[in-house]
Amino acid sequence: FGLQRFRIDYEGTKNLNDKTNTILEFKIKRYAELLGDTYLVFTLPTVYSPIYHYATEEGPTVTNKNGHEFAPYEFKWIEEIGTNMIEEIEIYSGGTSLAKYSGEYLNCMKERDFSTEKKELWNRMTGNIPELYDPANANGYVNNYPNSLFTEDGLSPEPSIRGRKLYIPIDAFFCDSSKMALPLV
């Protein structure tokens, strides 16, 4: 008896629809007899929040086009982005719905059931970390947003927020314990 981990890639377009909800359906092939811990994995893109330099007639001073004080764009992700991206999860087997819950439910379950250490791990996995939702106060910054500066020397700018993979555990009824699993027979 052995345990094998495998990855199931989504078959279809991998872009999120910005006008309507995106529905992703996965079919679990019968690689084994039982299905255990299950995760959704999303990749957040790298974000560059720039400060643009507009040259004026007087010279290359930093000002906006109207001559007013310049306020740069400061992008940040929302808190609990990994679970807030999920509106609904439904698990089917043989055409029968076995479970249905939301990303908000996953969040509430974390707050209700997990220890402090497990919450910290969950937050790192799902992207609920200051580097994503409060970059102006993360990584040693204090109310100082890490804007990307594009310079004339051709060097690549440092991103404001680095891209990363989010791992969202689908804590279904068969994932509660290592002794539990969903039969794939």
What are these language model-derived features?
Residues 1-185:
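Short, low-complexity Pro/Thr/Gly
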